Structures are given as C-alpha cells and as structure tokens.
Amino acid sequence: MIRKRSLMSDICENKRRKLICGDSESSIDALPSDTKSALSYIASSFPTEKFTNKFPPIVLRHQIYAFVKCRTDVDKELNELKNQGELILFRIGERNNQLAIIYTNDYTQYIDRSCRKSPVIENFLKKVLAVCPNIKYSNTVLRTDYGFCEEDIAELIQQGVLTLGQDVGWYWLSIPRVGEFMKTFLYGRRAILQHVRRTKYKEILLNELQQRKLPKKALLGVSYHIYDIIGSDAVNKIETSSGVMLRLLTEHIRI
C-alpha cells in the first residue's frame, strides 16, 4: 500500500544512511516540521557565494510546502512573520501567487550594497518597508502617505526595488537583479526535471535523484530544486518498497 510521507523524514533518512556508510555528509538531528524552521533550513543552504551579485538567501514559498503539510498554516505564519518585520515577501516570476522570501536584515543589507546608499531607497526602507512591509504598493499611497514624487518612484523601479504591477498604478516589491536569480533558478529546475523525464516511466527514487549532478550553471544545487519540484507539485511523492519515489506529473512531461 502506497502512503504519503513527510519530505524531510525521507531526505534525512537518506542522509543518515550515507553517514552510516561513510559519506562525509552530516546527519540532521532536528527535522524542520514548522514554517519558521523549514525557512531557516532552506535559507541556510543557499549558495550566496556562487552568485556574482552575492544574493541573500532566497527561499520560495512553495518550497516550504515540501516540509509542512498544511499550506494554509504556512501562509498564515509567513504573513505573521512579515508583519512582525522578520522577513519580506515579494512576487517572483509571472504568476501572482509565486512568492519569494528573504529575511528583512538580509534584504536591507543587500539593498545597501546594491544601490550605493541612495537617499530615495534609504527613505523607502525606513519610512515604508519598516512600517508597512507589503508585497505591493499603490502609486497613490507612496505619494500621499509617504511623500514620494514620481521621480522617486521611477528611481525605485530603476534600481529594482519595485517593479511595475499588472494593474495600473500598482508596484510589486522586488529585489535588484532578480532576473539573474530567476535565470539560474529556471535553468536548474529544467535540469532536474530532465533527470526525471529521461527515466523510462518518468519517475525516480528520491535518494537516486539526490545523487545526480546538475550542470555547472545550475548554481542552486540539487536539494534546492528538489524542494522546488515537490513543493510546486511538479512531481508526486509516493512511498514504495524501494524508498520514496518522485513521479513526474503529466503536464510537466514535456517542458
């Protein structure tokens, strides 16, 4: 009988087996089973040093879904952490519901490095983001409530702190040079899905996929993309007598 099982139990069990067999990879004593712990776990493995622009750890919201079963609880806790000023959420990609997460301190430090102490951006961080850490802002609110003029807003967009929203007069919070991250992320996603797609039945054991190598341009690493494809429902995760199996969903067979 096939039954569901938590991702982290599977991954950690595989890592413990490697340790017993002499692999250099360390075992994990505490398994993240809540939103905050899962966020910290994923962020801690983000390869900042591999990026020219030294991105801060970027975690996709749906990656946390691979660890925590109840997505409503994840969304609720992330929103609470955002309102408490611990992290920021921003849209990434073309879909409105695809969100990324960065710790607030990491975000502000990265902005300081990237934007060369711009007075407009410093004003935005202190007067807007620190007080009202929203995912998007209206032109009216920025001008009326916070005193930004059109030239200021244009600079925020030019520097990559804001991006134009689909609705007229609205702007999404963003991060400078996010396009570089997205290019790398999508490249790695395609690469790891190719490993699954090339198998005979479009399925692969989790511990086998963890051992696969990605191209050098896939900077984010195998684990990062495993959390992605499970959390985004690109694959179904099922348990078999041989271990956890990842099975590609029909709509992802040809990408």
Give the residues covered by each predicted segment.
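Non-catalytic recognition/regulatory regions in large multidomain proteins
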Residues: 1-255
